[in-house]
């Protein structure tokens, strides 16, 4: 009896995945995200959306980690945007509602911003690699040093 109580006490600190899953199942579901169509957006423009995909990390860069920039983008572009995670978190599906010309303009703008962020990330990775190589080269005692005149 005492051993069972001690075992139970030691198990409280360590939760098994099944136990954690049961705790998650007991939690209430989050409320569904319901969006109301803005007053300035015509209903007929909801019929034919434009859909394209980007990497998930790019969506965080473009729209912010909590997608806080989307309402401002919608207001300035006069288009509605939805960003949904697909492919187990690797891709996001971006849906643009609005007039065809506006849809294409928003898609073009987002793809240009995505290109900029990809280039910025590639440059940052190259700089890290270069810094690592320079530090390794500077700490190598057998490397020839250029004389400073």
Swiss-Prot record:
Residues 49-110 form the KH domain. One of its GO terms (cellular component) is subcortical maternal complex. Changing residue 37 to P: Found in female infertility with early embryonic arrest; uncertain significance. InterPro entries: KH_dom_type_1_sf, KHDC1, MOEP19_KH-like. Its main location: cytoplasm. It is found in: Cytoplasm; Nucleus. Keywords: Cytoplasm, Nucleus. GO terms for molecular function: RNA binding; structural constituent of cytoplasmic lattice. Component of the subcortical maternal complex (SCMC), at least composed of NLRP5, KHDC3L, OOEP, and TLE6 isoform 1. Within the complex, interacts with NLRP5, KHDC3L and TLE6 isoform 1. As part of the SCMC interacts with the SCMC-associated protein NLRP4F. The SCMC may facilitate translocation of its components between the nuclear and cytoplasmic compartments. Forms a scaffold complex with KHDC3L/FILIA, and interacts with BLM and TRIM25 at DNA replication forks. Component of the subcortical maternal complex (SCMC), a multiprotein complex that plays a key role in early embryonic development. The SCMC complex is a structural constituent of cytoplasmic lattices, which consist in fibrous structures found in the cytoplasm of oocytes and preimplantation embryos. They are required to store maternal proteins critical for embryonic development, such as proteins that control epigenetic reprogramming of the preimplantation embryo, and prevent their degradation or activation. Contains an atypical KH domain with amino acid changes at critical sites, suggesting that it may not bind RNA. Belongs to the KHDC1 family. This is Oocyte-expressed protein homolog.
């Amino acid at each position: 009896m005492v051993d069972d109580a001690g075992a139970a006490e030691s198990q409280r600190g360590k939760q098994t995945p099944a136990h954690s899953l049961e705790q998650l199942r007991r939690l209430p579901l989050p409320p569904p995200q319901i969006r109301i169509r803005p007053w300035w957006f015509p209903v007929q423009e909801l019929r034919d959306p434009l859909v394209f995909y980007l990497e998930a990390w790019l969506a965080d860069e473009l729209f912010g980690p909590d997608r806080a920039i989307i309402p401002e983008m919608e207001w300035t572009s006069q288009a509605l945007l939805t960003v949904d995670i697909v492919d187990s978190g690797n891709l996001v599906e971006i849906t643009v509602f609005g007039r065809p010309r506006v849809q294409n303009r928003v898609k073009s703008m987002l793809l240009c911003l995505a290109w900029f962020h990809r280039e910025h990330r590639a440059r940052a990775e190259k700089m890290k690699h270069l810094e690592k190589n320079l530090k390794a080269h500077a700490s190598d005692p057998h490397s020839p040093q250029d004389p400073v005149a």
